[in-house]
Every structure is written in structure tokens, then in C-alpha cells.
A protein has these predicted regions:
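Extracytoplasmic/secreted envelope proteins and their assembly/folding machinery
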Residues: 12, 38-42, 59, 63, ...
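Segments of small-molecule ligand-sensing domains
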Residues: 115-235
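Extracellular/periplasmic periplasmic-binding protein-like sensory domains
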Residues: 71-145
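Short beta-strand elements in bilobed, periplasmic/extracellular small-molecule ligand-binding domains
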Residues: 19-32
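Structural motif
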Residues: 30-44
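Short, small-residue-biased leader/transition segments that mark boundaries at the very start
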Residues: 3-8
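Periplasmic-binding protein-like
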Residues: 48-59, 77-81
């Protein structure tokens, strides 16, 4: 769940930058790919009043369910993951977050051809073109493309930090310190087992939480205010 938790929080902060009073409800499927559970989660969230259904799982279950609910008269939209969801949700899809894998593969192959060992801890972003969003859907608000371009430019030049600590609170308080244990744990057995012993380092510098700079694996796990996580996974 750790990677998903980080993506939940940055999605929330992105929406909150436009709609300050937004609230987010989170349901877990405990799977990277389960069409039925993802669809059921989307339907349950929409029934609870959610208007935008985001996902950090790989199937088309959530976008398809969102489109079905929208066709039935609900006001609801989808933000997908990894691939363009417009074929699945032609009017409900707003966009998808996606990884641009050719950037990494080009780096990997070039390193090998040059006789160099590729980095084992690699994480890049907008500046290198390693992440992006897919085409915008037909029902995005007027001016969205221009705003997206503005935000992407700010991410690239470093003037915008997603995890600016002035933009969120934890239990009503501004966070000023966040020591991160960089030990790598294997959670596959249900009991965490340390497979690499790392140092503990401070993640907050210059007023923002510096995600994915101390290591490539996500480590932003602060439970920020405004997000409710359902305790039980989707059945």
C-alpha cells in the first residue's frame, strides 16, 4: 500500500489546489489488477457522493464503472492509471497518470552499451519526461489544457513542489520534520522483514517534503487531513 498511499496524497493535494474544501474517500482492493473489485469500489464511492474516481490499479474496472454510472445520470468522472482510458470511458475519462518507460529503457540500454552499471536506485519525473498524463477527455473544463501546461512547467523548473508543507496538515498541525527510515522491508509474508538496512534521514527541506530523492521507492506516508481511508478492503 505504501506506493498507493503516496499517490493518493499527491492526487488529493492536486485537486485541493483547485477546490480547497475537497474531501477524499479511499477504498483498497489489495490487488494491482482486479476488474470486478475496482468496478465495485468505483460504484460504492460514487454512491457515497464521490464525483471524481481516481485509481492506482491497472485495470479498466473503475473507469468502466464510472462511465456506466455517468450514462445513468450520475455526475462522475474518472482519472485513470498507466494508459489512456478514453476508449473505456469516452465521456467520463478526464486523463490518466502514466509512466513513460522508454526514458528509463533508453538510459538502461545506453548505460550497458557504454560499459557502465545502471543505477539500482533510479527515479525521474517531468523534467526528464519520465512521467506524463494522457490526452484530456472531452468534458474537461475550459482552460484545463492551459493550466496543465502551466503546472507542468512549474514542476519542471522547480517553482512548484507537490508536497509543500504549507499546503497540508496532519491532525490539524503543520508538519516541520519527517525522519524517514530508508531501510527496505519485504512485506510479502505479512510480517515486515528488513532486506536492506538504511539510514534515517530528514525528508523535509526548505518547506517541502522531498519525495523520491532519498530513494526511488515512495516514502511519503503522512496521513494528511482531508482523506478518509476505509479500514476494510473491497470484498
Amino acid at each position: 500500500r505504501r506506493q498507493r498511499q503516496m499517490c493518493i496524497r499527491d492526487s488529493f493535494l492536486g485537486v485541493q489546489s483547485v477546490y480547497p474544501n475537497v474531501a477524499m474517500e479511499v477504498m483498497y482492493t489489495n490487488s494491482w489488477f482486479d476488474i470486478d473489485k475496482e468496478g465495485a469500489a468505483a460504484e460504492a464511492l460514487i454512491a457515497n457522493g464521490s464525483v471524481i474516481i481516481g485509481q492506482h490499479a491497472d485495470s479498466t474496472g473503475a473507469p468502466a464503472a464510472t462511465q456506466k454510472q455517468k450514462d445513468a445520470g450520475k455526475i462522475c468522472y474518472s482519472v485513470g492509471y498507466n494508459i489512456d482510458m478514453l476508449e473505456t470511458a469516452p465521456t467520463a475519462a478526464l486523463t490518466s497518470a502514466t509512466n513513460v518507460w522508454e526514458v528509463y529503457y533508453e538510459y538502461l540500454f545506453k548505460s550497458m552499451m557504454d560499459g557502465e552499471n545502471p543505477a539500482t536506485n533510479w527515479s525521474e519525473g517531468y523534467n526528464e519526461g519520465a512521467v506524463a498524463i494522457t490526452d484530456l477527455g472531452p468534458e474537461v473544463a475550459e482552460g484545463t489544457a492551459e493550466k496543465v501546461a502551466e503546472v507542468e512547467a512549474a514542476l519542471k523548473d522547480g517553482s512548484l513542489h507537490v508536497f509543500d508543507t504549507s499546503k497540508f496538515t496532519v491532525n490539524g498541525e503543520t508538519v516541520t520534520t519527517a525522519p524517514i527510515d530508508l531501510t527496505f522491508y519485504d512485506y510479502s509474508t505479512g510480517t515486515p522483514v528488513a532486506v536492506y538496512q538504511g539510514d534515517t534521514e530528514e525528508a523535509i527541506t526548505d518547506g517541502y517534503f522531498s519525495e523520491s530523492t532519498l530513494r526511488s521507492a515512495p516514502y511519503f506516508s503522512l496521513r494528511i487531513d482531508g482523506i478518509t481511508e476505509d479500514a476494510d478492503p473491497v470484498a
